[in-house]
């Protein structure tokens, strides 16, 4: 069995996928460019990947391929309909980061509500505290987390856990119904109503044609000027141009992002550049999922997916 891992550096070097118990060859590449994917995959029975794109045209040229083992939860880099038509199994790993991502979101909430970014940056770049003439200074807003309203968009594993933890902190939690829904399900609140009420909006919905640019100029305009946006879901859920305009013009109070539309971003990405000067914009490099325990769970489950597929033949 020939197994090829196309983007080994997409998971931390400290964690390796356990090798299968059955006879196999295992080849790894740090990363794979689109023009390299076919050549590296053409003789593979199993491809392991996180983000390498497999569309219908490419999959149709890989008659040996039996399984794509995804080292992630999301599968939007794979044409799932084409894989099904061609008899290629696709196995992902849901739920492995159900502790790590919610904890990251909570960290972002506290960072935004207590203006950690601005206060820390002042000390690093301008010695503001040393020259202020007082034991403290309050240049940036500090607001309580307890009592704030959290609007959760996406009530899956991650969104539900974020909501549970937020309630333990004394927050009021609203789960948003789908945009434009004709009926409001029990336990949900109408989409626009959540945007209008929330002090913090956090995104945990999958990326689909419907959710792309879910947060745009129109939806940002519905948010309070004192509200914050958090995105640890998928970059394209947010219109980055509209978000930057909202931040620079005070239409919302701040944002924290773990994902961007293009990853890795270009050096001149406007949001990246803005984060160097704005005290209310926090960007982390898609690491919300990557706690030690989460990555351990991930690599073990990928290995188990491969073992189970070969043992069961499906």
What are these regions (language model features)?
Residues 30, 71-72, 88-99, 177, ...:
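Short beta->alpha connector loops at strand-helix junctions that form conserved
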Residues 53-65, 210-229:
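Rossmann-fold NAD(P) dinucleotide-binding segment
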Residues 1-44:
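N-terminal glycine-/charge-rich "phosphate-binding" loop or analogous flexible N-terminal tail
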Residues 226, 232-314:
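Rossmann-like dinucleotide-binding domain for NAD(H)/NADP(H)
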Residues 52, 73, 199, 205-207, ...:
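Short glycine-/small-residue-rich Rossmann-like dinucleotide-binding loops
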Residues 44, 62, 197-198, 226:
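An anion/phosphate-binding loop that grips the pyrophosphate of nucleotide cofactors and donors
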Residues 86, 94-149:
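Phosphate-binding beta-alpha-beta segment of Rossmann-like dinucleotide-binding domains, i.e.
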Residues 136-225:
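Rossmann-like dinucleotide/phosphate-binding beta-alpha-beta segment
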């Amino acid at each position: 069995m020939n197994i090829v891992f196309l983007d080994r550096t997409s998971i931390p070097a400290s964690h390796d996928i356990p090798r299968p118990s059955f006879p196999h060859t295992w080849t790894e590449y740090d990363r794979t460019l689109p023009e390299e994917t076919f050549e590296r995959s053409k003789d593979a029975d199993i491809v392991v990947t996180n983000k390498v794109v497999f569309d219908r045209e490419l999959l149709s040229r890989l008659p040996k391929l039996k399984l794509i083992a995804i080292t992630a939860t999301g599968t939007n880099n794979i044409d799932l309909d084409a894989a099904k038509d061609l008899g290629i199994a696709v196995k992902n790993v849901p739920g492995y980061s159900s502790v790590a991502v919610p904890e990251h979101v909570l960290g972002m909430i506290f960072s935004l509500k207590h203006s950690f970014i601005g206060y820390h940056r002042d000390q690093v770049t301008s010695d503001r505290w040393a020259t202020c003439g007082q034991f403290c200074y309050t240049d940036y807003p500090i607001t309580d987390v307890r009592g704030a309203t959290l609007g959760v968009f996406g009530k899956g594993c991650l969104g539900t856990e974020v909501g549970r933890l937020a309630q333990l902190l004394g927050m009021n939690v609203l789960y948003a119904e789908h945009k434009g829904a004709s009926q409001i399900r029990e336990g949900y609140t109408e989409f626009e109503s959540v945007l209008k009420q929330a002090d913090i909006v956090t995104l945990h919905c999958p990326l689909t044609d419907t959710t792309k640019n879910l947060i745009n100029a129109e939806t940002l305009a519905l948010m309070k000027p004192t509200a914050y946006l958090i995105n640890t879901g998928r970059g394209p859920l947010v219109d980055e141009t509209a978000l930057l305009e909202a931040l620079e013009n005070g239409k919302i109070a701040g944002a924290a992002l773990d994902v961007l539309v293009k990853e890795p971003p270009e050096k001149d990405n406007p949001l990246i550049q803005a984060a160097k000067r704005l005290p209310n914009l926090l960007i982390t490099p898609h690491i919300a999922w990557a706690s030690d325990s989460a990555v351990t769970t991930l690599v073990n489950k990928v290995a188990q997916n491969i073992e189970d597929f070969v043992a069961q033949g499906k």
